[in-house]
């Protein structure tokens, strides 16, 4: 049974490299039933699937994420879902749709349902290839050269 005093967390992109580790870590911290993993097409690993709730959603279709927010009484979202560079360069419209329209849908849900927190990570890809990788200055100008970098800026 979910604990009402703990955050109720949704992790989009939970089947990805970072999302899967984040989900498992959040489940350890907040309890398995308080963290809902969500993916689109990729089947979850047995560890991810068996350690707590899992839902298939499409962030470009707001109603699929909205159903999960309502059903699980979500108050925090970690929005990890994204189309990465390899696919994004071949399918730029898909990258735009998932990475920007998907983010918009998540932010609108957060506004509508008055969620406590939304985390939307960026990427080193937003800086472009000429930016120093270590100790990147705070005032560095963003010069992304990939669809992924552009849509994560």
Describe the predicted segments one by one.
Residues 60, 90, 94-105, 142, ...:
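Glycine-rich NAD(P)-binding loop of the Rossmann-fold in SDR/ketoreductase-type enzymes
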Residues 12, 38, 77-83, 118-124:
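SDR active-site strand-loop-helix element
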Residues 30-43:
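Conserved glycine-rich Rossmann-like NAD(P)H-binding loop of the short-chain dehydrogenase/reductase
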Residues 49-61:
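Rossmann-fold cofactor-recognition segment
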Residues 104-147:
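Conserved Rossmann-fold NAD(P)-dependent oxidoreductase catalytic core, especially the SDR/UDP-sugar
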């Amino acid at each position: 049974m979910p604990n009402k005093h703990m955050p109720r967390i949704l992790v989009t992109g939970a089947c990805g490299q970072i999302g899967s580790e984040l989900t498992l870590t959040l489940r350890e911290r907040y309890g398995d039933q308080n963290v809902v993993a969500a993916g689109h097409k990729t089947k979850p690993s047995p560890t991810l699937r068996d350690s707590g709730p899992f839902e298939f959603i499409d962030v470009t279709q707001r109603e699929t994420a909205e159903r999960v927010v309502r059903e699980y009484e979500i108050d925090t979202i970690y929005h990890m879902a994204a189309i990465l560079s390899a696919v994004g360069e071949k399918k730029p419209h898909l990258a735009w749709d998932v990475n920007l329209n998907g983010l918009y849908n998540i932010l609108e849900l957060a506004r509508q349902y008055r969620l406590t927190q939304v985390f939307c990570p960026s990427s080193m890809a937003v800086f472009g290839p000429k930016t120093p990788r270590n100790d990147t200055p705070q005032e560095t100008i963003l010069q992304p050269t990939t669809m992924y970098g552009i849509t994560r800026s």
